[in-house]
């Protein structure tokens, strides 16, 4: 019997492919407003500080390809065909949906490479995909809202956290704290009943409990540069506060809201948070990001198959 064909729409934030893309990329993020020359220069310096344009573009594509392969390897009923759709740079979400339609794909399942639901992120991706599909008259898209508590996803982080704690002396472990974080969003989402903060708290609790970590805290990072209040505490402030109030001398940063090595992790954690730990005379740790690790890819595949009940 012929396999049923299904689109696999993998959506992500996107990143500049080369330095010349930085301005148009950030102009898109800023809803068509060009960044000032100062802001643009600051962004270029940040990319320079992490060794050049972030590897995110290559990693995202690799994650998507590996997910397609894994899904086709572990079941025989459906042949998945992957389409990559990005939020702020080509191929845009709409481009991917259009391509599916042109390829005759009637049904698709979509997953966003971010574990926690929010109206700002997951919902906006899903709405863009569905709006384009509706305009074209197909495909039907089965969206995934969240996978923040998927056991295999939690297990990936538990393993990485345990490795870090195992590298410490008993004395260091006693004064170590795990900081679990995600990208901050404007505070107004709370008033709207957005589950984003609650889902991050759930992920943090699951990881800490399963890894046997006594001391942990939830923080936010990479807040936007706008006048409105953003979710806090910021991870840098939290680091200083925990050191001052609790006397922690080792900090293990787990930016679970992200799934790859990119600017927010390589700069905001590995440079900015590390600078704070150096200022207060503490140790800095940051377990490796999921990227295209087979265990992480398997977690995503499990999430997709659960959504279409295979």
Curated annotation (Swiss-Prot):
A GO BP term here is:
heme biosynthetic process
EC id: 4.99.1.9
The pathway to which it is assigned is: Porphyrin-containing compound metabolism; protoheme biosynthesis
Could you name the domain of life of the organism this protein comes from? Bacteria
The entry marks the following residues as binding Fe(2+), namely: 183, 264
- What are the GO cellular component annotations? cytoplasm
Quote the subcellular location field of this record.
Answer: Cytoplasm
Q: Which GO terms describe its molecular function?
A: ferrochelatase activity; metal ion binding
Ligand binding (Fe-coproporphyrin III) = 13, 30, 46-47, 54, 125
What are the entry keywords?
Cytoplasm, Heme biosynthesis, Iron, Lyase, Metal-binding, Porphyrin biosynthesis
Please list the reactions this protein catalyses. Fe-coproporphyrin III + 2 H(+) = coproporphyrin III + Fe(2+)
InterPro entries membership = Ferrochelatase, Ferrochelatase_AS, Ferrochelatase_C, Ferrochelatase_N
Which PANTHER family does the record associate with it?
FERROCHELATASE, FERROCHELATASE, MITOCHONDRIAL
Which NCBIfam families does its entry note? Answer: hemH, PRK12435.1
Q: Which HAMAP family match?
A: Ferrochelatase
The family annotation for this protein states: Belongs to the ferrochelatase family.
Name of the protein described by the UniProt record: Coproporphyrin III ferrochelatase
From which source organism is this entry? Geobacillus sp. (strain WCH70)
Lineage start: Bacteria, Bacillati, Bacillota, Bacilli, Bacillales
